[in-house]
UniProtKB/Swiss-Prot annotation:
GO terms for molecular function: porin activity. The keyword Metal-binding does not apply. This is Opacity protein opA65. Keywords: Cell outer membrane, Membrane, Signal, Transmembrane, Transmembrane beta strand.
């Protein structure tokens, strides 16, 4: 222990590497709805991405256990998908080709997380203190998707009497689909790490935390974070 026999208020700054995971938790669509993009969570149902972000905490050290409030902001994740589908039909004296083009753009942003933690320190030496803790967090997530497209129909006459007529094309837009959601959820997590006292009142902190953000529509969102930071006790 250092200042105040290890007791007192403290501030902490961390740089965290977060692995963000979204998994869908509902039956796959079938029948007429199988090819339908119906909700934002359909689009973002299997995210595997990561971000590096800062985190700040303020807390109080009771000399064996701590409480802390923390705040973090995350990186916006973007994705674009495009698809082309062609269908050719033989209709009487013509060949009809229907080409459907789709362009989908989406963003997913774990905007912020505000949490409250209870942490227990194990003092195995004067300077090294492993710890474990639990966290309750209030998370804000925004996600949106926009889909646009067009349909091109090409009608080509079949050869008749040795002559071949030219193709006739017509293009029409597909109504745009846009959805924007903002979700706020209460989630729970756990943490573990080690603190190393490097100077009176100054501790180097290396830790891991898991946080379950809760359900977003029909998906589950969670993060795994590894962090490195410094803690200063007043």
């Amino acid at each position: 222990a250092s200042k105040g026999n290890g007791r007192g208020p403290y501030v902490q700054a961390d740089l965290a590497y977060a692995a963000e995971r979204i998994t869908h938790d509902y039956p796959e669509p079938t029948g007429a709805k199988k090819a339908q993009l119906s909700t934002v969570s359909d689009y973002f149902r299997n995210i595997r991405t990561h971000s590096i972000h800062p985190r700040v905490s303020v807390g109080y050290d009771f000399g064996g256990w701590r409480i802390a409030a923390d705040y973090a902001r995350y990186r916006k994740w973007k994705e674009s998908n495009s698809s082309i589908k062609k269908v050719t039909e033989d209709i009487k004296d013509n060949y009809k080709e229907t080409k459907t083009e789709h362009q989908e753009n989406g963003t997913f942003h774990a905007v912020s997380s505000l949490g409250l933690s209870t942490i227990y320190d194990f003092q195995i030496s004067d300077k090294i203190k492993p710890y474990i803790g639990v966290r309750v967090g209030y998370g804000h997530v925004r996600h949106q998707v926009r889909s646009v497209g067009q349909e091109t129909i090409t009608v080509t006459p079949k050869p008749k009497n040795g002559t071949q007529g030219g193709p006739v094309k017509s293009t029409s837009p597909i109504p745009a689909y846009h959805e924007n959601r903002s979700s706020r959820r209460l989630g729970f997590g756990a943490m573990a790490g080690v603190g190393i006292d490097v100077a009176p009142g100054l501790t180097l902190d290396a830790g891991y935390r898991y946080h379950y953000w809760g359900r977003l529509e029909n998906t589950r969102f969670k993060t795994h974070e590894a962090s490195l930071g410094v803690r200063y006790r007043f």
